[in-house]
Amino acid sequence: MQKQQLWERYKNLLYHDAELELSVDTSRIDFPEGFLEKMDPRLQQAYQEMEALEQGAVANPDEHRMVGHYWLRAPELAPEATLAEEITSTLAAIEAFASSVHGGNIAAPDGHRFTDLLIIGIGGSALGPQFLADSLGGPKDLLRIWFFDNTDPDGMDKVLSGIGAALKQTLVVVISKSGGTKETRNGMLEACQAFERAGLHFAGHAVAVTGSGSELDRTASRENWLGVFPMWDWVGGRTSVTSAVGLLPAALQGIDVDRLLAGARACDQKTRSRVTRENPAALLALSWFHATQGKGTRDMVLLPYKDRLLLFSRYLQQLIMESLGKGLDRDGKEVLQGIAVYGNKGSTDQHAYVQQLREGVHNFFVTFIEVLKDRQGPSMEVEPGATSGDYLSGFFQGTRSALYEKGRESVTITVRELSPASIGALIALYERAVGLYASLVNVNAYHQPGVEAGKEAAGAVLKLQGEIMELLRRQPNRDFTGEEMALALARPEEVETTFMILRHLAANGDHGVSVTEKDKIWENKYRSKD
């Protein structure tokens, strides 16, 4: 296609909204003539399902739950007045709490103001707050923010080392809907120990974001934590960033959460349109459907040309892959749906995997994200007539053209600048696009049975570890190979898992397991040191 033809196609397909200061360009997705019209009946059904969801229909039948993350930025849409009041009062409580922390009215037990903020959570309880912190944070942050987002001991040690002596002035927010998420529980216990070793009272530094009556809620109440904020069962983790999960850390950091919500609300209003060309989320969903043949046949490569959007690909990985990656459709038919998402940032990626994108296997489509405003304040010229930002823009446009020359399709999303409002709009845009696409391919976007299966399997490993430790302690003078241990436990089918558990136990001194190494690693002998 000639450049003039591409320009005409660009004008024909471009969505631009002056209020949102956002554009969605699908001109480099090779929709055939009449594709939008052909898909309209299916989209109308998707719009109808989305409207029912917003009105309070049980959109997650597996868990018999409503799905209400859109109400978080428009409480008046909630199907019950009590829900609207809870949303409104929670936002007011978040802002009041953050103001009291910033003003020193809520302080550490020794009276010092809080200077640092440690967020403990995993999945959506960490990815959303991390994305907001990284995209909108800066030198004027009111609290320095840190994260425990895994159950990796060394990772937590690294964070605590970074906090250092400021631990005594660190506010801790523990986020878990059920209160029983093991990674989050482990992080909380590690933090408790760090505070105790420093001679500090953890409860005097702690805040919970959790479900009413959860294990974490009971702990916070019993120990008189500084505060508890709600997580409702009608908000999923991956769509919780505009709830207390994301708003409390952001407000404490000093981000304008009202503008964040306003941006999301404005985008929600635009993406309710049933006129597809006037609905940016629908255009995204159609792009995904065409690029992947509605079967996930291609990956989505996310290339934001902005360092502050580096974590957006990780945030979207969960939002898209956990929502769309399903083995069964809503009728119980096996479909193996999903779209794999990966990415980093431009122009860094031009020196990494863009080589394969242009010249290698064609199993992807690209989403470019362009931010027009380079920085706050003027830029120097790195050469006559050109700034660093000019180069970034040039590299974006050049990569887009170079890929399309080789038949690599792409979508480009453009925002004028990064702000709480534009980040809110991007979040809302993708939440809606995921919901619409899920309707197009007939999957439930609001459950995650595979995640639960992984948790159950992990629990089985820990149970087997307990059995191994019990046998080692009962027979302290006996050496076991992995195979011998599995047979002794009458679990021969678990020999590989048994071997891996023994290797890990011996590598760490916490459980008192020693190893005698042999030429063949699977013949290594393990015993209790006790």
UniProtKB/Swiss-Prot annotation:
InterPro entries per the UniProt record, alphabetical: G6P_Isomerase, Phosphoglucose_isomerase_CS, SIS_dom_sf, SIS_PGI_1, SIS_PGI_2
EC number(s) stated in the UniProt entry for this protein: 5.3.1.9
Keyword Isomerase assigned: yes
Keyword Nucleus carried by entry: no
Active site feature: 322, 351, 455
Enzyme class label: isomerase
Pfam families attached to this UniProt entry: PGI
Keywords: Cytoplasm, Gluconeogenesis, Glycolysis, Isomerase
GO cellular component: cytosol
GO molecular function, one term: glucose-6-phosphate isomerase activity
Pathway per the UniProt entry: Carbohydrate biosynthesis; gluconeogenesis; Carbohydrate degradation; glycolysis; D-glyceraldehyde 3-phosphate and glycerone phosphate from D-glucose: step 2/4
Gene3D superfamilies: Glucose-6-phosphate isomerase like protein, domain 1
Residues annotated as transmembrane: none
Catalytic activity: alpha-D-glucose 6-phosphate = beta-D-fructose 6-phosphate
Localization annotation: Cytoplasm
Source organism superkingdom: Bacteria
Family annotation (HAMAP family): G6P_isomerase
Listed PANTHER family: GLUCOSE-6-PHOSPHATE ISOMERASE
Function per UniProt: Catalyzes the reversible isomerization of glucose-6-phosphate to fructose-6-phosphate.
Family assignment from sequence similarity: Belongs to the GPI family.
UniProt name for this protein: Glucose-6-phosphate isomerase
Source species of the chain: Citrifermentans bemidjiense (strain ATCC BAA-1014 / DSM 16622 / JCM 12645 / Bem)
Source organism phylogeny: Bacteria, Pseudomonadati, Thermodesulfobacteriota, Desulfuromonadia, Geobacterales
